[in-house]
Amino acid sequence: MGKNFLNDFGLPAGAKFVCFTIRDSAYLDRHKANENFPSRSWKYHNYRDGDIDKYVLAAEELARRGYYILRMGVKVLKPLKSSNPKIIDYVNSAIRSSFMDIYLGAKCNFCISTATGFDDIPGIFRKPIAYSSLTPFGLTINHDEKSLILAKHHINKKFKRRLTVSEIFLSNVALCIKS
């Protein structure tokens, strides 16, 4: 079933592919209006969000290097804008499913993520994960030595400069879980 899906999206047998999972507010926002969370606001998670438009160049470069890119997720704010046939907005496809989420996470060459629940799937299958704009930095989970972690920039507004890694930890910003 999984191989048939890849074929349906135009991936030849044995093609290299990357799972892209860029967090935005859409996933949590869908819980606003249900009976379990009648007045719950998830805005305190907004500092963790990424903008998919800022990742298009990375996707294009990976496609140029021979990879297919599959954008993962359950619900997203906006589509991935690329006309490259190797860049697939799987999250917005009619054939997105939980089974395929697991299959893709297990079979990908690696994953690029801003830290979402999906990361656990490639992690369980020991796939390398490149974390981008990761925060909170002090709560980092590193699956193995093949993973890469790029922290979100932390800016000192008073001095108008980026904090060093040491300053992030010394100021306790590394463990902040709210904007």
Where are these regions (language model features)?
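Catalytic donor nucleotide-activated moiety binding site of glycosyltransferases and closely related
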Residues: 15-29, 50-97
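Short, glycine/acidic-rich beta->alpha junctions
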Residues: 47-54, 93-97, 103, 111-117
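Surface-exposed alpha-helical segments enriched in charged/polar residues
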Residues: 7, 56-60, 103-106
